[in-house]
């Protein structure tokens, strides 16, 4: 689950980090009032969406008066912002953040952290190249990114943060401020179950103060039950409607741009299914994992979800029965096909627990389902069914 910038800054501030002060505004008048409240000569109006690249897309503007703040807010709120991280429709802007002007600054740094699956540790990253796309820095100048793996038994130690500060070229009071920032960020990361955290840029002001000018936080969705207050910050308007509906039925769904709908049990098998569809010349319309313990109700909802996509011209169902029984899946498929009134070809591959029984149920149903013998045969048949 992603947080908006203003939410991320509020959370980080509660852990002792110095952040760029700001006020969220849901309409142009509130934006104008926020400018006056901040009391500076300048302010920055930022569209609050769950996407990066806002500045390049026109979602970040410097304003010099309350009237300008009102005008910029009016141009953003109620519109969709399209950035390099969104699809063609963009993300809806329901609010803007009006933030204090912290510039000029002497330096812009980068600080971030992720759960590194290879090392199985929280890994911090820091760079002197703040204020730009960190992906470009990682690609073009990987040596400019410092990495610190944190031992989960002892946590981030002050000496590790100081070492990073020295390597970033900080000095004097800046070092202590950076250490406090990094330690506070780690504490927030662990206590709030972050999956990803970024401050870009982390600015060094002329007075030596270190301030978080931006904030990006992604929370581990599997841990949200432990954080009801954070869950209350969820903005469903920023989520894909189909993915949101899928999550309500405990389905793992990601919309893609192809025309072959996929229903699979198990993430690994789902990825392999998408790969082989591509190999045979097709394009998957989605990633959909119904889970290892799929129920009949969940399979029916998955079918509806796939066919809600107007781009889907064929469906491939690939089930390997382990915990889930193939005969139960077959019954759910029949029920779903009848309920949804399917008009596109449906290829079904069943293997494993009660696969033969499931295949017989499908064959005796009288429905025009296309059976497949093996994954390659399934991919070949679903691609050919498109004509």
From Swiss-Prot:
InterPro entries: ATP-grasp, ATP-grasp_succ-CoA_synth-type, ATP_grasp_subdomain_1, Succ-CoA_synthase_bsu_CS, SUCC_ACL_C, Succ_CoA_ligase-like_bsu, Succinyl-CoA_synth-like. Binds 1 Mg(2+) ion per subunit. It comes from Francisella tularensis subsp. novicida (strain U112). SUPFAM superfamilies: Glutathione synthetase ATP-binding domain-like (SSF56059), Succinyl-CoA synthetase domains (SSF52210). It is an enzyme of class 6 (ligase). Its EC number is 6.2.1.5. Succinyl-CoA synthetase functions in the citric acid cycle (TCA), coupling the hydrolysis of succinyl-CoA to the synthesis of either ATP or GTP and thus represents the only step of substrate-level phosphorylation in the TCA. The beta subunit provides nucleotide specificity of the enzyme and binds the substrate succinate, while the binding sites for coenzyme A and phosphate are found in the alpha subunit. NCBIfam families: PRK00696.1, sucCoAbeta. GO terms for biological process: succinyl-CoA metabolic process; tricarboxylic acid cycle. Its cofactor is Mg(2+). GO terms for molecular function: ATP binding; magnesium ion binding; succinate-CoA ligase (ADP-forming) activity; succinate-CoA ligase (GDP-forming) activity. Mg(2+) binds at residues 200, 214. Residues 9-245 form the ATP-grasp domain. The gene is sucC. ATP binds at residues 46, 53-55, 100, 103, 108. Keywords: ATP-binding, Ligase, Magnesium, Metal-binding, Nucleotide-binding, Tricarboxylic acid cycle. The keyword DNA damage does not apply. Belongs to the succinate/malate CoA ligase beta subunit family. Pathway: Carbohydrate metabolism; tricarboxylic acid cycle; succinate from succinyl-CoA (ligase route): step 1/1. It comes from the Bacteria. Substrate binds at residues 265, 322-324. GO terms for cellular component: cytosol; succinate-CoA ligase complex. Heterotetramer of two alpha and two beta subunits. This is Succinate--CoA ligase [ADP-forming] subunit beta. Pfam families: ATP-grasp_2 (PF08442), Ligase_CoA (PF00549). It catalyses: succinate + ATP + CoA = succinyl-CoA + ADP + phosphate; GTP + succinate + CoA = succinyl-CoA + GDP + phosphate. The keyword Cytoplasm does not apply.
């Amino acid at each position: 689950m992603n947080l908006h910038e203003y939410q991320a800054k509020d959370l980080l501030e509660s852990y002792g980090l110095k952040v760029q002060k700001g006020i969220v505004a849901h309409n142009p008048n509130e934006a104008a009032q926020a400018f006056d409240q901040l009391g500076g000569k300048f302010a920055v109006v930022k569209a609050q969406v769950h996407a990066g690249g806002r500045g390049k897309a026109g979602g970040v503007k410097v304003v010099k008066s309350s009237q300008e703040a009102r005008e910029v807010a009016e141009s953003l709120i109620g519109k969709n912002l399209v950035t390099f991280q969104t699809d063609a429709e963009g993300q809806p802007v329901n609010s803007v953040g009006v933030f204090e002007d912290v510039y000029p600054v002497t330096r812009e740094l980068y600080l971030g952290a992720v759960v590194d699956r290879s090392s199985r540790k929280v890994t911090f990253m820091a760079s002197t190249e703040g204020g730009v796309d960190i992906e470009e820095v990682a690609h073009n100048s990987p040596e400019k990114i410092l990495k610190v793996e944190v031992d989960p038994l002892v946590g981030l130690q002050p000496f590790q943060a100081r070492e990073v500060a020295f390597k970033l070229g900080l000095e004097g009071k800046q070092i202590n401020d950076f250490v406090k920032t990094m330690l506070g960020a780690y504490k927030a990361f662990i206590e709030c179950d972050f999956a990803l955290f970024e401050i870009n840029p982390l600015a060094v002001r002329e007075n030596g103060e270190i301030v978080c000018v931006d904030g990006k936080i992604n929370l581990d969705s599997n841990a949200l039950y432990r954080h009801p207050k954070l869950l209350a910050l969820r903005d469903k308007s920023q989520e894909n409607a189909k993915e949101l509906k899928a999550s309500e039925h405990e389905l793992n769904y990601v919309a893609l741009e192809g025309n072959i709908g996929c229903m699979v049990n198990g993430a690994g098998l789902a990825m392999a299914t998408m790969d082989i569809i591509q190999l045979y010349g097709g394009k998957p319309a989605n990633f959909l994992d119904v889970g290892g313990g799929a129920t009949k109700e969940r399979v029916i909802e998955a079918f509806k979800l796939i066919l809600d996509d107007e781009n889907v011209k064929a469906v491939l169902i690939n089930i390997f029965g382990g915990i889930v029984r193939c005969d139960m899946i077959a019954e759910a498929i029949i029920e779903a096909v009848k309920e949804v009134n399917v008009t596109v070809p449906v290829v079904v591959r069943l293997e494993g627990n009660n696969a033969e029984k499931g295949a017989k149920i499908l064959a005796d149903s009288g429905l025009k389902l296309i059976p497949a013998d093996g994954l390659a045969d399934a991919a070949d048949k679903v691609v050919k069914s498109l004509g």
